[in-house]
Amino acid sequence: QATRAELWSWRKTPEGRLAEIIVLDQFSRNIYRDQPESFAYDGLALALSQEAISLQLDAQLNPEQRSFLYMPFMHSESKLIHEFALKLFQRLGNEINLSFEKKHKVIIDRFGRYPHRNAILGRVSTPEETEFLLEPNSSF
């Protein structure tokens, strides 16, 4: 239902909206691990997160909840989105989450995408990406 945007009634509360985002952003990554579908709902999760922030619903959530609300920004392959993500995680004040965002942003700034997704998504890796993927901690 979430993948078809049928859970709009959940969006009546900040917690309900967060639940829908978690289903789209987190559940899909685990249910469809190593399959293209694991990233298929990233755009919808990001749009819902952006809208929640625009409506200032994040202010009604506790810091742990906000970290999950902001996760779709970290999963994006957009440099522009990562600029905003960095600000979100800095404002959140959790050093662990901020550290992870910085690591994600470095990869996006360098490649414009996450090379570890290439094989799953049927994308051809560049020689630089292939070399990067041989390094420790090159994927999440």
Spans of model-derived segments:
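Intrinsically disordered, low-complexity activation-like regions
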Residues: 1-34, 39-140
